[in-house]
Structure formats: structure tokens, C-alpha cells
Amino acid sequence: VACMQGMRTGGMAATAKHFPGHGAVVADSHKALPIDRRPLTELTDELLPYRRMIANGLTSVMVAHVLFPEVDEAPAGFSARWIQQELRWGLGFTGAVFSDDLSMGGAAFAGTVPERARRAIEAGCDLLPICNDRPAVLATLTELEGAADPLSQVRLVRLHGRPMPAREQLRKTAQWAECQRAID
């Protein structure tokens, strides 16, 4: 929370990742789909950092390409259960939801990259990174042309960074003085 607040003071928005958690799996979602077999009742500790950051004004979350079969049959980044029910309704999150990179191995089960993008949007994602694959980006843009959700657009506009305070203004704040004392 302190890091997020410091970023906000500096004019930046923070993104919490990888909701609902990536810590109890072995597989690397860049290459394969990790599976976490714990039931939702055992994931409360994983959700606590998100709950705290949301209560303190978190503006965006990136969802994980991790499958939690005891909760939903779709991985979190393609799951309305995780994005709409748990994150938005359960934790009260109103900010932007990023998919993890749709070109990753953990997303491959969902079909072509444009199909992955459509499934992520249907689940509730607002922004869809597609890294290092220009042809897939172009195919996705063509296939999803006109699919913009006005509510997603509003959430994304709210992410625009705040004007960064002048360095001299920052030096006059109590936070600056406190940090300086800690460093010295």
C-alpha cells in the first residue's frame, strides 16, 4: 500500500498483479497454464493484499493466467467468476482490469490470439496486452473492431497519470522529509 501511495504522489498509477494469486503454482504461465487446486476458502490470504490496495484507491489489476478448477473452469484472466464476482463485486474493485499477455502459453487453451482477446473481454478485462507478436495484434484489432465497451473506456481514461508535481514541490512535503530522514 505504501508503494502504491508513493507512486500516486509521484503522478503514477499502480497495477496490482497477478490476481487472484500466482504464488502456489509451479508452472510458468509464460509457457504453460498453471493450476492451483485450492478451493476459494483457502485463497483468502492471497486476496488480502488486493483487498487492502483496493481500499486505498488501487486503479488497476492484472489478472493471472492461472486455473483454479475448484472455483471456475476458466483461468482467472478468462473468468467472469473471478473478474466480475470476486474482484468487482466481492472486493469492490471499480478500476481497470488488465489481462496478462495474451501471447503467453498460459492463454493458449483459449484459441487464437483474437479468440483469447474476445474471451478476456467477455470475462471483464478492459485492456489486453499482446506482446512481441505484431501480426496477432493486427488480427485482433481487425476482429474486434467496434467492440469497445464504453464502461471499459471510462475505466481506462481514469488510468491516465496525474500531473507529476515539480521536484521542488515534492521536497517541501512531509513525506519527502520523512524519507530523507530514513535515508540519512
Can you annotate each of these PLM segments?
Residues 1-152, 157, 165-167:
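Second-shell residues forming the walls of enzyme active-site clefts
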Residues 153, 159-184:
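A short C-terminal boundary segment appended to hydrolase-like catalytic domains
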